[in-house]
Amino acid sequence: MKKLIVSTAVATLLLTVPGMAKAEENKEDWDKPVFIKGADLEGQDLQQTEDDLGVKDDYETYSVTTDDVSKYIPNSGNLRYIYSSATIKHKKWGNGVDVEIDTPDNITKVTSEQYQNASITAGIKDAEIHIASVEKVTGEGALAGIYKAYEEKGNELNSEDIQNSNKEMQDLTSISKENQNKDGYSDEALNASIADIKQQLADIKKKQDEQITPQQVEDIVNKVLDERGLSGTLTDNQKQMITDNMTNVANSNALTSDPKAFAKNAKDALKGIEKNSGDLLDKAKDKAKDLNTEENRNFVQKIWDSILQIIQSIIDFITNLFNRIF
């Protein structure tokens, strides 16, 4: 009888542990939404920001200062004031990360797709994030505020994942700036590629216990950039920057600790980008086809030119030979 009781207790405990683990994993399911306000907001500017973000009385409020930006995004530069703000609402497990910039004209450096990819890299899960500012700003203050809010709520993100997230965002911003107005390029195409790569890396990790190799990362990066029409648009240096960032992601705590959830977040991000990008993604692919066709033409032309040169050389040789004889 005692054995039966003990066995039942053990079985109950074993059944309970996964639920406890899931509850621990989902402790980010906050009861109240969070409002992260730029520390320099006051009066009418604060009210306008709250209106833009739809902040209600039941929101928990945290302030983000220039010191916070220096702490969480150390390479952001010397910001003198913080106006960019954000809200975070948590969703049920498996619903991904959504980011919307409610004042797109005032966020000058970071796009919603970059925020989304950066959030996933940092290890944020199942969140609806809104960004806004009453003044034109880079938007880095809001991102630092998001990291701070997670720490304040007891859900501190892995510091290396945050560093990876910051580097990724800065590098993607740099790549976008360097390719701005280039035919066939779009920020949406780049960020769709990044989300696609992340999903495929997580899918690999789900199938293997060992660490993802650098060669696996490089193969996926090259394949995705080629499929999405960016291989011929980006420089070798830019491709290497992407490969380096994705290597960081492959080894990150965010991916390796829960590849299934990471893959789901990346997949949802990719779907969102594809849904909201219109024909921008197709334009990149079409441009790649045009470039490929032109390259093929040039290749064929070079072969034909070489053949003509050989024929001309033979003719010149024979002509010179006959001139010497006669």
Annotated model-derived regions:
Residues 1-4:
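Positively charged n-region of N-terminal signal peptides that target proteins for export
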Residues 15-27:
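Sec-dependent signal peptide cleavage junction
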Residues 259-314, 318:
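Amphipathic alpha-helical membrane/lipid-surface binding segments
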Residues 8-16:
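Bacterial N-terminal signal peptides
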Residues 120-233:
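Soluble oligomerization/assembly scaffold segments of membrane-associated complexes
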Residues 53, 119-123, 149-157, 176, ...:
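Sec/Tat-exported extracytoplasmic proteins
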Residues 71-124:
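Signal peptide-directed extracytoplasmic domains
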Residues 24-64, 75-78:
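Long, low-complexity, polar and repeat-rich extracellular regions
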